[in-house]
UniProtKB/Swiss-Prot annotation:
Keywords: Amino-acid biosynthesis, ATP-binding, Cytoplasm, Glycosyltransferase, Histidine biosynthesis, Nucleotide-binding, Transferase. This is ATP phosphoribosyltransferase. Belongs to the ATP phosphoribosyltransferase family. Short subfamily. The keyword Ligase does not apply. It catalyses: 1-(5-phospho-beta-D-ribosyl)-ATP + diphosphate = 5-phospho-alpha-D-ribose 1-diphosphate + ATP. Pathway: Amino-acid biosynthesis; L-histidine biosynthesis; L-histidine from 5-phospho-alpha-D-ribose 1-diphosphate: step 1/9. GO terms for cellular component: cytoplasm. Disulfide bonds: none annotated. SUPFAM superfamilies: Periplasmic binding protein-like II. InterPro entries: ATP_PRibTrfase_cat, ATP_PRibTrfase_CS, ATP_PRibTrfase_HisG, ATP_PRibTrfase_HisG_short. It comes from Syntrophotalea carbinolica (strain DSM 2380 / NBRC 103641 / GraBd1). Its EC number is 2.4.2.17. GO terms for biological process: L-histidine biosynthetic process. It is an enzyme of class 2 (transferase).
Length: 219
């Protein structure tokens, strides 16, 4: 199977967006149509394989060479810090990584005055780096879901989380006070694969660059 090019893709919307983009450069997999519960899909004619994995696991599959390429959010790459080649911003999956707090705190405090705070987040590494650069001492509480709940029940005064529209935060009485960064989906490549399958992988990257440039020109 070493002649296959293998992609690791997050299950759900990012996988669908990825396959729509790949189709524009002739990379397709008819086996993926429908609601299959399979986790590995192949196109024997074109020698492409696709693995459906958890978003946070994509970098690991690519790092260890189980996949040659992957698509993953920049937030995951920043949090995990793995040694991966990241040639392309794919321009979809846009959201923002923000610091948020209850509205009453926002009215009474200036973020510039923070010195020692408690923050709940799925992104402890990013959060620690961000506040360390500002000279703010932070106590981190790692959660895996429903981050907005933490300030409501007194677990933490503030949170760091991804937002797209911000509706969930507003519905829970939270306001964004700082933006850590803008997040989009990225193409990542295993460094060994880039050498052993250089021609095919380079062609994929170049074709995607062309399509992304064309799409940007049409906006």
């Amino acid at each position: 199977m070493s002649d296959y090019i293998t992609f690791a893709l997050p299950k759900g919307r990012i996988m669908r967006d990825s396959m729509e983009l790949f189709a524009k450069i002739g990379i397709t997999c008819p086996e993926m149509s429908g609601d299959s519960r399979k986790l590995v899909f192949e196109n024997p004619e074109t020698k492409f394989r696709f693995m459906a994995v958890r978003a946070t696991d994509v970098p690991t599959y690519v790092e260890y060479g189980c996949a040659d390429l992957g698509v993953v959010g920049k937030d995951t790459l920043l949090e995990q810090g793995k040694d991966l080649y990241e040639p392309l911003d794919l321009k979809f999956g846009y959201c923002r990584l923000v610091v948020a707090e209850p509205g009453e705190l926002s009215r009474d405090e200036d973020p510039a005055d923070w010195s020692n705070i408690r923050v709940a987040t799925k992104y402890p590494n990013i959060t620690e780096r961000y506040f360390a650069e500002r000279g703010v001492q932070v106590e981190l509480i790692k959660l895996y879901g429903s981050i907005e709940l933490a300030p409501l029940v007194g677990l933490a005064e503030r949170i760091v989380d991804l937002v797209s529209t911000g509706a969930t935060m507003r519905d829970n009485g939270l306001v964004e006070v700082e933006t850590i960064g803008e997040i989009t989906s990225r193409l990542i490549v295993n460094r060994a694969s880039l050498k052993t399958k250089h021609q095919r992988i380079t062609r994929i990257i170049q074709d995607l660059e062309r399509v992304l440039a064309e799409d940007a020109g049409n906006d």
